[in-house]
């Protein structure tokens, strides 16, 4: 969710090492023990301190590493201090501009972290919601991986003893397209693996047993 009234934000943090272009100020509704959750906001500033945009989250969950306790006032935190990320920066659609993903709860596969994804619109000069990337970051096991070299996004999922790996390519004008799928079935002592690769718009399937 984008701009809205900030009637919460009892605990304030700032992250300066997450992006080359932006600093982020995080406000969380509730912080106890080693983590924060509840309604929250992420405010982006450029490196000169100019406010750029605000994002709201219904459940901005993040956890600190052991022996780190939040306190009152604005606290500077680094990614090395966190064991669960409230936000990610990266070029998620490979258009040369930095995008952002904001934690929206634990709506992923098996209760894993889920994120709202916003991509930078060079025409509007602001971040706009991406429905398909949000679905990719909310329906699997945590935030998707970004491979800048192959220009692919990777996600993982699990269903009982079966493990899934998916790779997507970002196609201009078409959005994200599934190009690779790996299924590992550990139901029995023998592991059955099925790999599907899209080659020249056709699926090539390989099955193995170990």
Language-model segments: what does each one mean?
Residues 24, 91-104, 148-155:
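Acidic/hydrophobic-patterned starts of short beta strands in beta-sheet-rich repeat architectures
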């Amino acid at each position: 969710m984008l701009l809205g009234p900030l009637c919460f934000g009892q605990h304030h943090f700032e992250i300066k090492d997450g992006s080359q272009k932006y600093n982020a100020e995080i406000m969380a509704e509730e912080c106890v023990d080693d983590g924060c959750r509840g309604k929250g906001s992420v405010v982006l500033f450029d490196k000169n301190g100019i406010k750029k945009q605000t994002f709201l989250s219904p459940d901005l969950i993040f956890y600190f590493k052991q022996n780190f306790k939040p306190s009152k006032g604005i606290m500077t935190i680094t990614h090395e201090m966190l064991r669960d990320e409230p936000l990610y920066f990266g070029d998620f659609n490979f258009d040369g501009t930095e995008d952002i993903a904001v934690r929206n709860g634990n709506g992923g596969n098996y209760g894993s972290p889920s994120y709202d994804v916003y991509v930078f619109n060079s025409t509007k000069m602001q971040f706009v919601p991406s429905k398909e990337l949000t679905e990719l970051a909310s329906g699997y096991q945590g935030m998707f991986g970004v491979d800048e070299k192959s220009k692919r996004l990777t996600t993982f999922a699990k269903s009982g003893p079966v493990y899934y790996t998916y790779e997507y390519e970002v196609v201009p004008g078409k959005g994200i397209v599934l190009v690779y799928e790996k299924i590992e079935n550990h139901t029995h002592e023998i592991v059955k693996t099925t790999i599907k690769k899209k080659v020249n718009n056709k699926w090539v399937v390989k099955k193995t047993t170990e």
